[in-house]
Amino acid sequence: MTEQTFILGKDAALEDSIAKFQQKLTALGFNIEEASWLNPVPNVWSVHIRDKDCPQCFSNGKGASKKAALASALGEYFERLSTNYFFADFYLGQEIANSDFVHYPNEKWFPIEDDALLPNGILDDYLLDYFBPNAELTPELLVDLQSGNYDRGIVAMPYVRQSDEQTVYIPQSIIANLYVSNGMSAGNTKFEARVQGLSEVFERYVKNKIIAEAISLPEIPKSVMDRYPSIQASIAKLEEEGFPIYAFDASLGGKYPVICVVLLNPNNGTCFSSFGAHPNFQVALERTVTELLQGRSLKDLDVFSPPSFNNDDVAEHANLETHFIDSSGLISWDLLKETPDYEFADWDFSGTTQEEYNNLMAIFRADEKEVYVMDYNHLDVYACRIIVPGMSDIYPADDLIYANNNMGMDWREILLDLPNWHHDAETYQELLEELDGQDIDDATRVREFIGIVAPKNSGWTTLRVGELKSMLHLALGELEQALDWANWTLNMNSSVFTTEPVNYYRTLISIIELHLDQNRDPAQYRAVFEKMYGKDAVKQAWAAVSEGGNPFYNLPASDENLKNFKEHQALLGAYGKLQKAKKENWK
């Protein structure tokens, strides 16, 4: 008989989950490889899996065993496939934008009939008050990045409001801008997945609250830790390696099913915190310890920040955002002080997965929070996305106005065309004025701004708005400004540039400085420049500075079909597999 391993919180054996997930991925046409494994301490495993054909599609898993980590990674992969999360930051092209459906067969399009007023039928009153308290949202802000199809309108998804089971249409733009990956889950059963999604919402909400408010937490008593010898073995190994560990009850007095573990690194005076949530205390504690080391070996524990006494810095939104991304943000010394702000609570919200779901929903009701859920079954794996306004937001609602991910929509066509080097000076001047007028951050990566997968080894992979400004000034023959932005580019990208662009920008800077010097004859220096920097770099930079040559260094041109961008086409190929499954399996 084949081995069957059951773990707390899961409704199927690990072996069955792994086999089912792997078979379904193969049937869908995804070519998954286990790219890296880590087992830095006993009972802590993590794995990184990815699609060999499309590296944008990847996931990570963690667990107390190798099988648990692989099942976790495969579950996360299905969660991201089912919710389209892998594709949330990318333009899907005109063909998909005009197809029967862009995201899901049950999406609803709301035509834009007034540039200033949101169409009727979008959101409910509660959500309108939450997302648009000052009536500042315009329809343009709710056009989704993936379709960029203003003429078609605003695309919204049907979410079920759990308080009364009513369907509410939430624009895809709001979901992608404010909630990113929070509250997404896939599982063996509906309630297993929902419990996971709700737990994640609590984990992130409580984590932010504790960090932002510098709350002091109670340690989990030794008598409670003694119940979990395998978790203690993991912690003991970390402490043996020189990393003191604190395990805290983060339930805020028994209210939320959350644990916090903090690792100190005396070697460089830094620390970092890990949070985990689940209705079962043991599962929450195990998740928190495995999360601490997900994707990290013991050598990777020296990249965090020292604790801080400046609680204003700790509470900054940018710091909380860093914690969401990789937990490397600041935490307050106050979190670690002797006297806690709450008593320890030996909480327990566990039961069957359906009972656990009901227990978690009761917490949201007590907090008077509306919960909205969209279910997905089109890949024959249950998945869901859960939105709890005021709790599961990763970014503030005003990001829709000031930092919308569709801001680059109107720029895509012209920026992709610039390297064709056939525009007039007036166009380059207008682009510079618009970049300043729209107050676009100079550090913005252009590929993210316009939603593309950059061709490997091309300048698009690292191009930022500041570097684009250098190129535009060069196109206008404005050498002093081009020089300023070339220096900015070299400084900004020093950690990401390979040797070739570093050499090109050194060459460009020297050649601009030479041509700005009225007392020197540039021709006298070309030969030595070629010896220093190489003939190819000198030829290209010299042409851009003084011979009317193309200043758009290492940028292949394209159009909005992006046919010559192989990596972007690979992403669209992966999305095509999903679109096929949606057409065939939508229930």
UniProtKB/Swiss-Prot annotation:
YcaO domain residues: 61-426
Name of the protein: Uncharacterized protein HI_1265
Organism: Haemophilus influenzae (strain ATCC 51907 / DSM 11121 / KW20 / Rd)
Taxonomy of the source species: Bacteria, Pseudomonadati, Pseudomonadota, Gammaproteobacteria, Pasteurellales
